[in-house]
Amino acid sequence: MLDEADLAKQEDYLVIFALARYAGLRLEECFRIDTNDAQKALSSGKLFVKGKGGLTRYVPICEDIKIGFVKMLKHRERGQKLFVDSDDMTHLAMKRLQNFIIHHRKKFAERRITFHGLRHTYAHEQYEKFIKEGCSEYDARKKVSELFGHHRDDVTRIYLAE
């Protein structure tokens, strides 16, 4: 998916895919990020996420996301949404990304890939990381649920189901 976005010169998609894959963000959460959020994340290493149901959380960001934010900030004015042009509508920008995935899905190794599937992959990796760090299964799930912003073990179990 990243290769396809790169070939299509969709730098914004590369950053959005990285946010889902390496920070566990939902599609809507990615499109809520504005330039101020990105600037603060670059300074602190943590992104403030406005999540589902008005819940907020901080998630750590990796180097790939930081590099992506720097690139995106060059093309945006202060206060503007990071992934939505000033003359565009958020729901249309989100729909274009979803169509990009659908259109290019047959080229991916895993053809059933979805945007939300990137979030599932992140959940699995974080869970395994916490287990390796010595957390109990319950505590590892609790930490994953905090990263995801829902704080519910039953929802986390769904993300971790094979």
What are the residue ranges of the model-derived segments?
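Basic, Lys/Arg- and aromatic-enriched nucleic-acid-binding interface segment
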Residues: 1-27
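Conserved tyrosine-mediated DNA breakage-rejoining catalytic core shared by Y-recombinases
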Residues: 32-68
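A short, glycine-centered helix-capping/turn motif at helix boundaries
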Residues: 19-32, 129-130, 150
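Catalytic-site neighborhood detector that most strongly recognizes the C-terminal catalytic loop/helix
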Residues: 53, 146-162
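Short basic/aromatic active-site micro-motif
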Residues: 110-130, 137, 141, 146, ...
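Active-site/catalytic core of tyrosine-dependent DNA strand-transfer enzymes
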Residues: 62-124
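Short, well-structured alpha-helical segments
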Residues: 14-21, 115, 153-157
